[in-house]
Amino acid sequence: MSPALAAGLQIAAVVIVLAAAYVPLGDYMARVYASPSDDDPSDDAGSESNGTGGGTALRTRTRPRTDSRVESLIYRLCRVDPRAEQTWIGYSLSVLGFSAASVLFLYVLQRVQGVLPLNGGLSGVSPSVAFNTAISFVANTNWQSYVPETTMSNLTQPMGLAVQNFVSAAVGLSVAAAVIRGFVRVRVGGELGNFWVDLIRGTLRILLPLSFVIALILLTQGVIQSFSAGFASTGLDGSSVTNALAPVASQEAIKELGTNGGGILAANSAHPFENPTPLSNVVEITAILLIPVALTRTFGTMVGDRRQGLTLLAVMGALFAALLAVTAAAEAGARGVAAEAAGAMMEGKEVRFGIPGSTLFAVATTGTSTGAVNSAHDSMSPLGGGAVLLNMLVGEIAPGGVGTGLYGLLVLAIVAVFVGGLLVGRTPEYLGKKIGRRQITLAALSVLVMPALVLIGTSVSVLLPSTTGYQGNSGDPGTPGSIHGFTEVLYAFASAANNNGSAFGGLTVTSDWFQTSLGLAMLLGRFLPIVLVLALAGSLVATKRTPPNPGTLPTHGPLFASLLLGTVVLVAALTFFPALALGPIAEAVQ
């Protein structure tokens, strides 16, 4: 089979599954996050006045399901009133409090794993690694500065890391639901919902069932599921090798579905125990994209105009397709001694996946906040590596992480509406809500968080003499080694600030500086935007909805999609072009 045909078949399989799941999954998630207060007749009138096709019919389709017995039991045990609503401040404090408790629990669990069951002879994790890992998994980044097989026990993996894979993804879904309510509701008190209800519903009704199905599919492909310590085998050179075993299938499913990315094995999805066949590779890519893509349908359903969701999906799809084309062309057309000897750019890639399966996975994992890898990104061609780096630098909105991609793109949509309003001399509006000074200020601050963390972290790191020894590639300024070394540092901070978790392997990040600085980048990159977008939703929910008029900029269709796409590209280009010119672009033209 030719590489072109293999690439086409894999892309077609992913697109077909995503298209089949788009409507049922998107509408199902809208029902999960629908609130009884959204059925208020005053809201229906508001939706109709906005001309979005909302009203009673829509509310009937999204009418919330009653709480299950399990959910009701959890509410009673945790003393949560599911009927209570929170303002953006209360919602933010709940998110931050829950995440802080999660960091503390995961840190302590790692430190004491040596005295707990199923430790496999492993001792407690060192303080710096435990700190970095706790923040990483709670922030949905899953950055791994350790070797999982020799660091984390078979109790820490499922009890600590896998649990965070579920709840960190559920936090992202909850925030996205709260932001959507900011557009849907009109509340003088500014209520956005109940974080604890959203968290529990997202975990029990969406993530757990889907993960169970995906885990079963992966088991049929040979992904392992075991609590044994491991087994010994003889390598090709005659030496004895210890092969680690772990409950991989159950964690692999939520690793991809929740756009987490942290592998239970060091080689991540390149390891045959995690991703053994081309079919399992397609399943994992589909799982990565499934919820972020369907959330655009959820958004359109909840706001009462599904064209809005399709417009966002078109922007996501255009960015994804463009970056996939660039990456695939760069990898397929790469030249050099190694590439010519192997017949293709196969360094760092698994033969069973080839270039098509590796590039599709790389673009999917960097276009979301997943960060899982089935190939070595550091071994990609300069343009290929630059493309996946750019995929993160545009904000991971193609299609973005679970929840984070949607609200990240909505923030950029508000910026695009504001720019469009300036062009025509009209007060900017989005879905009937006027975008004033407070709204655009919060949106701008949210957009600026990630670039500030990436550029400041990178510049300080490359200036510190103590970090030079941790760069696998270095040399005099302007030499190929120094250029690629700079790209490795830039990639690390882009990955951390965007809560991605993938890395260029040539950079050693076990020093106290990188453990701490990248940990802070993950922490601030996750929770500062969450607080800002919740504040934005709080200001929108208290804003009256205005009916459209002849001067209103339509926020659906090709015109607005082009405006939004241009805004995304312009913001990324103005912010990161100098850094990219010093890194992958300079490396490519040498």
Protein language model regions, located:
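Membrane-proximal intracellular helices of multi-pass ion channels
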Residues: 1-590
